[in-house]
């Protein structure tokens, strides 16, 4: 009863709750989750990240919070605080070391998730971003049934056909839970090469499969060419097919790999860079969908 009341209190203290899902692993879902949280924090919002990936928690490393320990006071768990003041809760904080596996059966894992929801002292938040393991199993089901007033799900995919197939399952899954789909994000969508040449010089670069990409340098000699590493547009076409919003595309950026390893997210290290700008646009699209639902009473499916 006490935990149930606490969950209801969370519903009042946290204005917006956004679930971030992907049907397939390896699409950069945790990178997107942390990026969304940091982009929101850059805009002045109070933000938290709830890492629900019990067996493979990566969010603390990406947020520069490795080896941190959670503070417990009067039976309440206090989140760690990362870049830009973002609060973080994760199973990683409870492990003896990063090599310790979590070998739990379903009921124990689900109990931990409910504890993360009901026993954490988040304080007042504008946004809680909830990061899940890949797939449509117990974790998102438990959160959807336990956490009140969820604004909706963000589905992360990459342009490959296999990832798109699984993202379609995530959309259908959200409909079965009656949780709105805020939209689809296409990650790793094109790799932009920037360079310097003679002013107005014509540039030709060979991309994957030998495809030629042509552009012309500007009056200062700067040029940009975007290569389709994994092709582009699959996320948008899937969103259109299912009648859900397309929130935007995020570029393939090797800096995310370095940032994830170093614990300094690309948005923090280059707040004016192309990736940070792309995340800001996606965040605005998410806020727009939430605002439309609140002001017009629309049901987003």
Write out the residue ranges for each language-model feature:
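Conserved catalytic-core segment of NTP-binding enzymes
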Residues: 122, 127-244, 249, 257-258
């Amino acid at each position: 009863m006490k935990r149930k009341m606490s969950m209801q209190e969370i519903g009042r203290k946290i204005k917006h709750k956004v679930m971030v899902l992907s049907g397939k692993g390896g699409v950069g879902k945790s990178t997107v989750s942390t990026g969304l949280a940091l982009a929101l924090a850059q805009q002045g919002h109070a933000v938290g990240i709830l890492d629900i990936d019990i067996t493979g928690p990566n969010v603390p490393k990406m947020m520069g919070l490795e080896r941190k320990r959670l503070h417990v006071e009067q039976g309440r768990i206090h989140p760690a605080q990362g870049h830009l003041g973002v609060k973080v809760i994760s199973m990683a904080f409870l492990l003896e070391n990063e090599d310790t596996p979590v070998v739990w059966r379903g009921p124990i894992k689900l109990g931990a998730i409910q504890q993360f929801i009901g026993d954490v002292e988040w304080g007042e938040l504008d946004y809680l971003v909830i990061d899940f393991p890949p797939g449509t199993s117990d974790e998102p089901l438990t959160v959807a049934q336990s956490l009140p007033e969820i604004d909706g799900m963000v589905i992360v995919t990459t342009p490959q056909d296999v990832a798109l197939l699984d993202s379609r399952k995530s959309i259908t899954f959200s409909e079965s839970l009656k949780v709105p789909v805020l939209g689809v994000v296409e990650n790793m969508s094109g790799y932009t090469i920037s360079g310097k040449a003679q002013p107005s010089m014509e540039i030709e670069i060979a991309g994957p499969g030998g495809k030629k990409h042509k552009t012309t340098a500007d009056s200062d000699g700067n040029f940009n060419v975007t290569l389709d590493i994994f092709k582009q547009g699959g996320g948008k076409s899937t969103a259109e097919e299912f009648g859900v919003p397309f929130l935007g595309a995020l570029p393939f950026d090797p800096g995310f790999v370095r940032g994830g390893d170093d614990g300094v997210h690309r948005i923090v290290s280059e707040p004016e860079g192309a990736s940070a700008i792309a995340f800001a646009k996606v965040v605005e699209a998410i806020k727009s969908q939430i605002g439309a639902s609140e002001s017009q009473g629309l049901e987003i499916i």
